[in-house]
Amino acid sequence: MDVDNGEGQVQVHLKTKQEHYAVPDVPYAIDGTVTTAELNTFVNALLLSKGSSAVDFDFLVFDEYLRGRLCDHLREKAISFEDAIEIEYVERFPAPEPQDCLLHDDWVSAVKASGKWILTGCYDNTLNIWTNKGKHILTIPGHTAPIKAVDWISLDDDTGRFVSSSQDQTAMLWQWNVGANTVECVSVCKGHERGVDSVSVSPDGQRFATGSWDTMLKVWSAELEDAGEGTSKRMKESGVRTPKITLQGHRESISAVQWMDASTLLTGSWDHTLKVWDLSLEGIKAEISTNKSIFDASYSKLNHLILTASADKNLRLYDSRTNQGSVVRNTYLGHNAWVQTVMWSTTEEFLFVSGSYDNQNKLWDCRSPKAPLYDLLGHGEKVLDIDWTNPKYIVSGGSDNTVRVFKSRKALVENMDTK
């Protein structure tokens, strides 16, 4: 076999974790030049003999998606062609479908979906609440500068509570009466000295954290009544809230903050670092140094990996659990301008989404560094924020004054979202 040209045959075992698509566990001799298309034909022919209908598969060879010829993939991994190769096949994740375009009056810099609602924040200083079917419910004034981040605290049929942060140096706590469709600002959270770019609510909904251009990380009570010590009677009466904890360690703006668990926070910064904070000790637990300013970061509770978005068009993957956290596990190539926003799926271990100044969203599998699974098109200008908190919807906001809503697989499979 002339392996230099990828000619001849390779012995492979075809495996799947989806038992209903399993084929006989025997070695198969296939041509070294096969691609995903030919492997699909081969596996479907085997399944057809079992009475199965045609299915689109993707193929993993040594934990990475096959994106070209098998022989080229093996050479790149320095795998001997004489070895029996295990190829795992998985049902291809279906392309998300565009559902809605929600028109705003200014740039949409913050989005967060929960249940049947979508919360947005804009550069005209307003918040907006929409249904996930595209109906506008409420416009909420209050901030005096562009809004940079939003997050839901709690939500049920009667009441919604959420937090917003802004370039006006504040975060604001809100309570929404769903039935009456009225909103009250519960507290104005003051303590930062520059704009507040990021906000994240704790898993139990009792606290939230903010990151700012003043380089500080602050933790606040998210309770309706802030009974903490040190809050003056005058501040309580005026609705002003002060932070419970202030943590210093970054040298430049904190662009991302996320709760990893009830007592651990992740931050990303323009100072090229990720930091993991232990709130019980009120200090830094771990630090990951990168070589680029971090515009956004996302931690997955499913796989414990961290993604970063940066100005060099690339996304990077880090492992927070190792002593070699600063070593890049993978780099994802596909955007043509700086990547502003990234988020892991909350239900699919390997999937994440990103949004970029190239006007595009992309859906990725972390095992496919060379290309995204899909481009999610629709924005006419820069993408500023993306959210996949609700497994049914990928939601993004942009400088084209729109929010784009895409149905994900969960919504497509359940067929619950016809207008």
From Swiss-Prot:
Main location, first listed in the record: nucleus
Keywords associated with the record: Nucleus, Repeat, Ribosome biogenesis, rRNA processing, WD repeat
Region Ubiquitin-like (UBL) domain, annotated ranges: 10-91
InterPro entries: G-protein_beta_WD-40_rep (IPR020472), NLE (IPR012972), WD40/YVTN_repeat-like_dom_sf (IPR015943), WD40_repeat_CS (IPR019775), WD40_repeat_dom_sf (IPR036322), WD40_rpt (IPR001680), WDR12/Ytm1 (IPR028599)
GO terms (BP aspect): maturation of 5.8S rRNA from tricistronic rRNA transcript (SSU-rRNA, 5.8S rRNA, LSU-rRNA); maturation of LSU-rRNA from tricistronic rRNA transcript (SSU-rRNA, 5.8S rRNA, LSU-rRNA)
Repeat in keyword set: yes
PANTHER family: RIBOSOME BIOGENESIS PROTEIN WDR12 (PTHR19855:SF11), WD40 REPEAT PROTEIN 12, 37 (PTHR19855)
UniProt-recorded name of the protein: Ribosome biogenesis protein WDR12 homolog
Source species taxonomy: Eukaryota, Metazoa, Ecdysozoa, Arthropoda, Hexapoda
